[in-house]
Amino acid sequence: MKKISLFVLCAVLPISGWAADGAKLDLNVRRIGLEWSKTDVKNADKYADSPVSALNADSQDFIKGIFDTALQYKKNRFQWDNALFMEYGETKLKPDDEPETVSENADDILLSTDLSYACWEFSGFKLGPTVRGAYDTEFKAAGDAPRQNILRSNAGISLFDNAIIKSLYLTGVYEYDFTYAGEQTSKLAAELGWRLEYQVREGVKLSTNGYYREYLSYSEYVPTDLERDLSAVVRLDTNLWGDLTMGPYIQYRRARARGVDVYGSNFVMGISFNYITSFGLIK
């Protein structure tokens, strides 16, 4: 938690110093909610030692909690997003005359800061360079695998701040992975990521976000390191009352590790109940 607190403090203090310059500062609650889901996992036995919980989970029903917020600062051509994403899902099974079993289906904490600059503006689009830093970890270890710990930096080009295309980027990636004690590795990759929103009609919004990451080189050989990683979410949110929404969603994760010759996948579909809003802190 000390790492998370330090990251948040470093992100917020510079923003507070610039706020007096007439810039815009918003706290976007992308969603805080619960998801009921049915999960179908393939080749989980091949990924039993992977630190990625989504690839070694059990196929079953579960309930998951989501917390996704972003502090967004805009001034002239600059946009600076500081985001915190957390999710956790766990199912407890207790068959008759058998001990209780616990299966972790989702576990992720992602702290990120993203700075983009609009070199060109046209037809409601902004295009320019983007840089990003992130710390990716978990609440606890998945089974016998260690708790994931990754520092990640991105640099590339981004299309952003559009009514539909909130973010669409192509970047190079550097990762420092210290998940395994004594086996710290550095990795280079290419990443395509997106966050899109479409207002179907009043009170109904379709949204999707995700990424595809292709790893290109590694400093060390670790069998559980991923070669390819795809993650995508699609949601349809319908307003129930005020800022409370409900709707179906689909989530898909597909990846392949260096030491495995088949892909692991995690397909989730279910119903999502969310609180979504935005607070204008500085206008």
Language model segments and positions:
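Hydrophobic h-region of N-terminal signal peptides that target proteins for export
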Residues: 10-18
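Outer-membrane beta-barrel transmembrane domain signature
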Residues: 167, 171-239
